[in-house]
Structure formats: structure tokens, C-alpha cells
């Protein structure tokens, strides 16, 4: 018998569903579509635009901006490849039409929103736009965009509300800055920008701004960026950003922010005493927190000390027939992870018997950073491998070289690879790469590592020449 005790009807209910999904991001959309494909009567509720962070203010528009920035850099290489112009292109001579490009980018995202909605409808998912909240009856009350209210009940409910950016609210003047969401609302390219944060979001945005010609400043608390990644990635990206001319302010933080009301410019005061003057935009990229405020207390769903929904390996919360996944539950916060978890959850809940124990394996999840150059990682860092297996039980292979593309160029971009192996069979437990096309390279090697590949398996693969990736199967 399915949760009639929990979802009792004590308020007028518009409709009852087999499955109700709160949040139309990557995980919610994937789970609702999969459930509907099995015949479940499914409702998806979204407060803003379909696709969530990834499609609207994350992966997709960010990658579009990265392409523009990367192309701007490569255009300056043209004359070194024999492509003559009257005036050789340089970062100073290239102009980027930010407002016009923003229109094209936003139109592309709008098309994707429509594709998401059409795909949901094709699968038979009902979509309601509005803000959902559990009421004290255990049902879901939705305030729609026209300010009308509907109440829905369901046998099973998924919470996939995602996350939102964190602000340093104790810093005087913090509100003068924006966040990574606000980056996509900028109508003009800032001449001078300060990005605060050493995580992948800050690194990507600082790189984009620099590539497009902005005077870019990056403020980090430690000595390196990307501190959750292996040291080969931390050191290579940090050093190259400095070499490229990004102003990396290390071992400091923002003390206060002031605004000149006449010019609109900001003064960003750092804790090391330095003041960054005439700043056009300040962007906080200090992490994200779960997007809550949906009445979880009314149904008793428990949170951890980071205010993330606690789930087990099957995405179950502590309340029967309420589930959670994606950023709001604090697991691996990546779009493909949420999609995979959402599909597996619906397989288990609504699919055939063979999927009754379906769950996502959160180990060996590949991730990339669209820095300049790109970085990719899967498995354990070297420090993690030492802690897990002991230093004497691991072997580390590294390679440092210049990709062929840069052989014709005076200014070289680094390529660094590291393979971490464990035990006498040298099972590959970690792979960390920095260099052009790292994201594309890592996808294939991710399959191999997920299957338990050893160093011998890598060695037995015939190399593709000439490529950078061949180094991974010829490394000694």
C-alpha cells in the first residue's frame, strides 16, 4: 500500500499523480521522462525555466562563452600558421561584440527550453510552472506564475530543486557584486573584472573574461586554484593563468567592497591590504547551497549540517516515498550524475523487475574544467590514493610535453598527464590531465577506468598518432 498515511487528502486536491517531481533541472526532467515512459502518471513542477542551472545559467551557456574565448585566443595564432593579414590579430586588436553575442546565446538557450518542454509533453509528462511547497497535509501546493494556487497529491515525490550561489554576507558591500548566475545577465563586457573563488566556476569565468580581453583578476584564499583536484591540475592551471596575464591574488580574500556613486566603479579591498580600483564587475563564485524553502519541515525530511537533503544510495530520504537527487542532496554535483541518478530512480520505482535494485555508482565519475587549457579528472587524486592504499602500494606515471599544435607557436600552452595505479596488477585508480581537448579525451578513458582497466590495458592499446591522447597509452 503506497503512502496513503503520509499523503492524506485534507485540502482540496486538483489532481493525483503516480509521480510528482519538484524541479525541472537535469535530474528532474530525466527522472520524470523515464517514469512517464513506463506509464506512470507524472507531474513536473518548475519555478523558472526548464533545464535548471545547467541549461540556463551553467554548463551550456558557459561552454558557449568558452568557445568564444577560446576562438579569440586561437585567432591570434593565425599569423604563426602562415595566414597573412594586413595587421596580425592580437588580444588588443580583437573586439568582441558582447551584447550581440549575448542575444544569440540567449536565443539558443530559449530554444533548448522549448525542446525540453516538447520532449516532456511527448513522453506524457504534465508540466506546471510555479513554486512548489509541501503543505501540512503532505500534499504539494503550487503557486503558479499567474498567482493562482493548486494542490497536488502523489504516491511518490522527487525533490530535485537544485542549488543557488553562495554570497559572503559578512563582507561589507557584498551586495555590490553579482554571482555566476548574474554573469549571464551582463549586458556589456566589463573592462575590469574581479572573480572571487578558486573552484571550477571561478576559474572558468576568469579564463573566459581574459580570453575576450577583459582585465581579469582572480582572488583565491590558497596558493592554488582547483584545490579539490590533483596537484598536477592545481599547479599547472594556476601557473599558466599567472603566465597568461590573469592577475591571481593568492592567499587573500575580500575585506570590503565600495562603490563610487559618480562613476559606478567598485573598489575591492583585499585582506592583504591591496585595493583593486576601477572595477566594473565583481563576481562571487564561492560555491553553491541547496535550494530549499519548499516546506520539507512539514513532512519531516531530514537535512545534514550543510542543509542538504540526506539520502541513501537509492536516493531515498528518511520519509517513505519521498526521494531526492542532484545538487539539493549534495552528492556529486554534476549534470550527467543527476541525469543518471534520475533515470535509475525511475527504473527502480516504475520499471520492470530487473531494475528493482537499480542505483547509481558514484565512484569513478569523470569531471572536467573548461579552463584555459582544459583539465579533466577521474578517480582518486594522488593524495587520496596514498591515504586509501598506502604509498608503497601505488605507482604514479606522469608526462609533461608540448602538444603538436603549439610547435608552430612561440607561446606554448602546457600539457600534463598523470596516471595513478594501485597494487601489483597496476589497476588504474586515477587519471588527471591538463591540455587541449582534455574533456573529449577523458570521456573514452573514463569508460576504461570504470571497467577496471590496468596500466597493461592502456599499454596494449595501439596509439593514435599524432595526438596528445596517445601519451596516455605510451607512458612509461
Curated annotation (Swiss-Prot):
<dbReference type="InterPro" id="IPR004099">
    <property type="entry name" value="Pyr_nucl-diS_OxRdtase_dimer"/>
</dbReference>
<dbReference type="Pfam" id="PF02852">
    <property type="entry name" value="Pyr_redox_dim"/>
</dbReference>
<dbReference type="Pfam" id="PF07992">
    <property type="entry name" value="Pyr_redox_2"/>
</dbReference>
<keyword id="KW-0274">FAD</keyword>
<dbReference type="GO" id="GO:0050661">
    <property type="term" value="F:NADP binding"/>
</dbReference>
<feature type="binding site">
    <location>
        <position position="26"/>
    </location>
    <ligand>
        <name>glutathione</name>
    </ligand>
</feature>
<comment type="similarity">
    <text>Belongs to the class-I pyridine nucleotide-disulfide oxidoreductase family.</text>
</comment>
<protein>
    <recommendedName>
        <fullName>Glutathione reductase</fullName>
        <ecNumber>1.8.1.7</ecNumber>
    </recommendedName>
</protein>
<feature type="binding site">
    <location>
        <position position="132"/>
    </location>
    <ligand>
        <name>FAD</name>
    </ligand>
</feature>
<feature type="binding site">
    <location>
        <position position="333"/>
    </location>
    <ligand>
        <name>NADP(+)</name>
    </ligand>
</feature>
<dbReference type="GO" id="GO:0006749">
    <property type="term" value="P:glutathione metabolic process"/>
</dbReference>
<keyword id="KW-0963">Cytoplasm</keyword>
<feature type="binding site">
    <location>
        <position position="198"/>
    </location>
    <ligand>
        <name>NADP(+)</name>
    </ligand>
</feature>
<dbReference type="InterPro" id="IPR006322">
    <property type="entry name" value="Glutathione_Rdtase_euk/bac"/>
</dbReference>
<dbReference type="GO" id="GO:0005829">
    <property type="term" value="C:cytosol"/>
</dbReference>
<comment type="subunit">
    <text>Homodimer.</text>
</comment>
<feature type="binding site">
    <location>
        <position position="418"/>
    </location>
    <ligand>
        <name>glutathione</name>
    </ligand>
</feature>
<feature type="binding site">
    <location>
        <position position="201"/>
    </location>
    <ligand>
        <name>NADP(+)</name>
    </ligand>
</feature>
<feature type="binding site">
    <location>
        <position position="116"/>
    </location>
    <ligand>
        <name>glutathione</name>
    </ligand>
</feature>
<feature type="binding site">
    <location>
        <position position="33"/>
    </location>
    <ligand>
        <name>glutathione</name>
    </ligand>
</feature>
<dbReference type="GO" id="GO:0005777">
    <property type="term" value="C:peroxisome"/>
</dbReference>
<dbReference type="GO" id="GO:0050660">
    <property type="term" value="F:flavin adenine dinucleotide binding"/>
</dbReference>
<feature type="binding site">
    <location>
        <position position="287"/>
    </location>
    <ligand>
        <name>NADP(+)</name>
    </ligand>
</feature>
<keyword id="KW-1015">Disulfide bond</keyword>
<dbReference type="InterPro" id="IPR016156">
    <property type="entry name" value="FAD/NAD-linked_Rdtase_dimer_sf"/>
</dbReference>
<feature type="binding site">
    <location>
        <position position="227"/>
    </location>
    <ligand>
        <name>NADP(+)</name>
    </ligand>
</feature>
<keyword id="KW-0560">Oxidoreductase</keyword>
<feature type="binding site">
    <location>
        <position position="327"/>
    </location>
    <ligand>
        <name>FAD</name>
    </ligand>
</feature>
<feature type="binding site">
    <location>
        <position position="26"/>
    </location>
    <ligand>
        <name>FAD</name>
    </ligand>
</feature>
<comment type="function">
    <text>Catalyzes the reduction of glutathione disulfide (GSSG) to reduced glutathione (GSH). Constitutes the major mechanism to maintain a high GSH:GSSG ratio in the cytosol.</text>
</comment>
<feature type="binding site">
    <location>
        <position position="53"/>
    </location>
    <ligand>
        <name>FAD</name>
    </ligand>
</feature>
<feature type="binding site">
    <location>
        <position position="236"/>
    </location>
    <ligand>
        <name>glutathione</name>
    </ligand>
</feature>
<feature type="binding site">
    <location>
        <position position="46"/>
    </location>
    <ligand>
        <name>FAD</name>
    </ligand>
</feature>
<dbReference type="GO" id="GO:0045454">
    <property type="term" value="P:cell redox homeostasis"/>
</dbReference>
<feature type="binding site">
    <location>
        <position position="343"/>
    </location>
    <ligand>
        <name>glutathione</name>
    </ligand>
</feature>
<feature type="disulfide bond" description="Redox-active">
    <location>
        <begin position="54"/>
        <end position="59"/>
    </location>
</feature>
<dbReference type="InterPro" id="IPR012999">
    <property type="entry name" value="Pyr_OxRdtase_I_AS"/>
</dbReference>
<feature type="binding site">
    <location>
        <position position="62"/>
    </location>
    <ligand>
        <name>FAD</name>
    </ligand>
</feature>
<feature type="active site" description="Proton acceptor">
    <location>
        <position position="465"/>
    </location>
</feature>
<keyword id="KW-0496">Mitochondrion</keyword>
<dbReference type="GO" id="GO:0034599">
    <property type="term" value="P:cellular response to oxidative stress"/>
</dbReference>
<dbReference type="GO" id="GO:0004362">
    <property type="term" value="F:glutathione-disulfide reductase (NADPH) activity"/>
</dbReference>
Amino acid at each position: 500500500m503506497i503512502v496513503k498515511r503520509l499523503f492524506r487528502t485534507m485540502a482540496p486536491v486538483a489532481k493525483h499523480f503516480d509521480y510528482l517531481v519538484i524541479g525541472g533541472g537535469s535530474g528532474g526532467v530525466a527522472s520524470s521522462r523515464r517514469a512517464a515512459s513506463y506509464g506512470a502518471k507524472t507531474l513536473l513542477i518548475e519555478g523558472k525555466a526548464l533545464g535548471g542551472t545547467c541549461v540556463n545559467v551553467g554548463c551550456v551557456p558557459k561552454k558557449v562563452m568558452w568557445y568564444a574565448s577560446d576562438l579569440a585566443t586561437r585567432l591570434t595564432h593565425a599569423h604563426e600558421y602562415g595566414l597573412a593579414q594586413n595587421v596580425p590579430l592580437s588580444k588588443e586588436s580583437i573586439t568582441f561584440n558582447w551584447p550581440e553575442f549575448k542575444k544569440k546565446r540567449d536565443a539558443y538557450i530559449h530554444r533548448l527550453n522549448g525542446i525540453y518542454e516538447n520532449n516532456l509533453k511527448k513522453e506524457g509528462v504534465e508540466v506546471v510552472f510555479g513554486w512548489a511547497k509541501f503543505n501540512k497535509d503532505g500534499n504539494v501546493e503550487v503557486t503558479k506564475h499567474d498567482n493562482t494556487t493548486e494542490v497536488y497529491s502523489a504516491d511518490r515525490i522527487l525533490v530535485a530543486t537544485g542549488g543557488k550561489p553562495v554570497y559572503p554576507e559578512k563582507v561589507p558591500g557584498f551586495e555590490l557584486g553579482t554571482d555566476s548566475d548574474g554573469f549571464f545577465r551582463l549586458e556589456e563586457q566589463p573592462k575590469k573584472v574581479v572573480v572571487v573563488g578558486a573552484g571550477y566556476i571561478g576559474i572558468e569565468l576568469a579564463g573566459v573574461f581574459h580570453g575576450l580581453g577583459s582585465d581579469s583578476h582572480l582572488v583565491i584564499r590558497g596558493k592554488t586554484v582547483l584545490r579539490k583536484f590533483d596537484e598536477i591540475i592545481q599547479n599547472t592551471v594556476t601557473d599558466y593563468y599567472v603566465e597568461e596575464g590573469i592577475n591571481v591574488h593568492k592567499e587573500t580574500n575580500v575585506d570590503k567592497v565600495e562603490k563610487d556613486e559618480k562613476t559606478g566603479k567598485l573598489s575591492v579591498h583585499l585582506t592583504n591590504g591591496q585595493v583593486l580600483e576601477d572595477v566594473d564587475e565583481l563576481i562571487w563564485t564561492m560555491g553553491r547551497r541547496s535550494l530549499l524553502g519548499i516546506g520539507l519541515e512539514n513532512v519531516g525530511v531530514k537535512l545534514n549540517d550543510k542543509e542538504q537533503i540526506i539520502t541513501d544510495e537509492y536516493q531515498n530520504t528518511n520519509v517513505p516515498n519521498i526521494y531526492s537527487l542532484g545538487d539539493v542532496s549534495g552528492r556529486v554535483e554534476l549534470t550527467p550524475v543527476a541525469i543518471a541518478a534520475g533515470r535509475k530512480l525511475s527504473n527502480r520505482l516504475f520499471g520492470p523487475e530487473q531494475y528493482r535494485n537499480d542505483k547509481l555508482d558514484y565512484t569513478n565519475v569523470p569531471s572536467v574544467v573548461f579552463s584555459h587549457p582544459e583539465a579533466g579528472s577521474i578517480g582518486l587524486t594522488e593524495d587520496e590514493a596514498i591515504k586509501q592504499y598506502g604509498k608503497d602500494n601505488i605507482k604514479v606515471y606522469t608526462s609533461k610535453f608540448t602538444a603538436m599544435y603549439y610547435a608552430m607557436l612561440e607561446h606554448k600552452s602546457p600539457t600534463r598527464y598523470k596516471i595513478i595505479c594501485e597494487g601489483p596488477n597496476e589497476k588504474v585508480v586515477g587519471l588527471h590531465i591538463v591540455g587541449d581537448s582534455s574533456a573529449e579525451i577523458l570521456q573514452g578513458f573514463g569508460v576504461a577506468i570504470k571497467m577496471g582497466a590496468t596500466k597493461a590495458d592502456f599499454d596494449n592499446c595501439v596509439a593514435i598518432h599524432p595526438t596528445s591522447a596517445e601519451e596516455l597509452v605510451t607512458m612509461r
